[in-house]
Amino acid sequence: MSQDSFKQYLLSEFNIQFNNETLLLEALTQRNYLNEHPDEPGRDYQRLEFLGDSVMQVSVAEYLFKRYPNWHEGQLTEMRIAMVQTRSFAHFSRVAHLNEGIRLGKGEEMSGARDRDSLLEDIWEAFIGALYLDQGFEAVRKFLDQTLFAAVDTDFFDRFIDFKSRLQEKLQKNGAVDIDYRTENEQQLSHNAQLFEASVSVDDHELARGTGKSIKDAEKAAARAALKLLEEK
């Protein structure tokens, strides 16, 4: 996608129009591109990536603080950690099509860098840093509302939360207990896929069950279900 097309895309999809377009170019520029174009002014994305990391931390913390007024500090911290996992940033770079605007060197382009998670993680933070410098926190929040924050009501961030450790910590708060996970059922699905059902019990009393495409995922789902039951009591 050309830079003009990418700027038009940002405007039509997110209502984002940079006042200082140099910031946008910097956020999308890899070092190898500048090495191959020494006559072009400007920097690569790395300084903006540094800034964007901090902007993400603050934006996510504020979002969670306001959205979940009854959550304690531990719950807020755990969810914040899950939401600012750099592994998730690569996903949201693709969702927002930031990968299509990156300025790459020819060698990096040929090696598939445009779809490389590590680069997309960096570009996400650099874009956030550039948007913050250009338009402030409110513009960043609006962009996140359409991308990262929109995923909060799905199970996307569950992959980054250790529900088994959370359950163990909660159950053993007042002393040692015996926590046992069992595989209760296994189904063979189409295309060689499998579905597992697992249970979690405490001192031989079953708390909850969960399903997943692997035993590990099923146990994690069971732990999550158990936590939900305990938190509702």
Curated annotation (Swiss-Prot):
Active site residues according to the UniProt entry: D53, E125
EC assignment: 3.1.26.3
Domain DRBM: 162-232
Alphabetical keyword list: Cytoplasm, Endonuclease, Hydrolase, Magnesium, Metal-binding, mRNA processing, Nuclease, RNA-binding, rRNA processing, rRNA-binding, tRNA processing
Binding site for Mg(2+): E49, D122, E125
Localization in the cell: Cytoplasm
Domain RNase III per the UniProt entry, residue ranges: 7-136
CC per GO annotation: cytoplasm
One family name in Pfam for this protein: Ribonucleas_3_3
Record text on subunit structure and interactions: Homodimer.
Name of this protein: Ribonuclease 3
Gene label: rnc
